[in-house]
Amino acid sequence: MPVVFVAASKLPTPFATFTMHGFLDEATGREHVVLSLGDIADGQPVLGRLHSECLTGDALFSQRCDCGSQLEAALQAIAREGRGVLLYLRQEGRGIGLLNKIRAYELQDGGADTVEANERLGFAADQRDYAICLPMLEHLGVKSLRLMTNNPRKVKALTDMNIVVAERVPLHTGHNPHNRYYLATKAGKLGHMLGNEHQGEVPQA
């Protein structure tokens, strides 16, 4: 996987001053970022998150998803721990891109769920590729994670790459009336582990 390290700098945030590591995927031209805090190369499991880019949720405060809340909660958790890593992956819209995500939102406004919308546009329900994470984690010396996620695909992807997932740390945040159906679909159709409040809420055909 031709993902190469480019540069690193300090990044002060309201939560902590992180080190920001920039990486380039030479195959796609996509630029990815890792935020790290503390000694993450000591061989002990590192609190971490794989966070896929979500412009609408992360930067525009959208309540259609829980992405922005999860990003903030993950950074806060790392800051509290004093040690951790967050991989910010440029895989907008579960890998379909921003404009296609807006097209998918348009279909959702017409009644489709998040999976149906992607499929109607000719995409898989989730097109993200986590193989790009391996060279970034190797560069940083991270071999074991306490992974903040509700998504079992992320756990499997890391395990398949021989990255130890020592613990799955749930991220239950960002629930609101606007994303109730979206979260139910993620639980019912994508297998996300979101708790009993979202199980069985997906309308049956």
Swiss-Prot record:
Which positions does UniProt annotate for Zn(2+) binding?
A: 54, 65, 67
Catalytic activity annotation: GTP + 4 H2O = 2,5-diamino-6-hydroxy-4-(5-phosphoribosylamino)-pyrimidine + formate + 2 phosphate + 3 H(+)
Give the enzyme's main class according to its UniProt record, as a single word.
Answer: hydrolase
Q: InterPro entries, per this entry?
A: GTP_cyclohydro_II, RibA, RibA-like_sf
What highest taxon heads this organism's lineage? Bacteria
A GO MF annotation of the entry reads: GTP binding
Q: Which UniProt keywords apply?
A: GTP-binding, Hydrolase, Metal-binding, Nucleotide-binding, Riboflavin biosynthesis, Zinc
Might you give the EC number(s) for this enzyme?
A: 3.5.4.25
Task: Quote the catalytic residue positions.
Answer: 126 (proton acceptor), 128 (nucleophile)
> How is the cofactor bound here?
Binds 1 zinc ion per subunit.
Any idea what job this protein has?
Answer: Catalyzes the conversion of GTP to 2,5-diamino-6-ribosylamino-4(3H)-pyrimidinone 5'-phosphate (DARP), formate and pyrophosphate.
Annotated protein name in UniProt: GTP cyclohydrolase-2
Q: Gene encoding it?
A: ribA
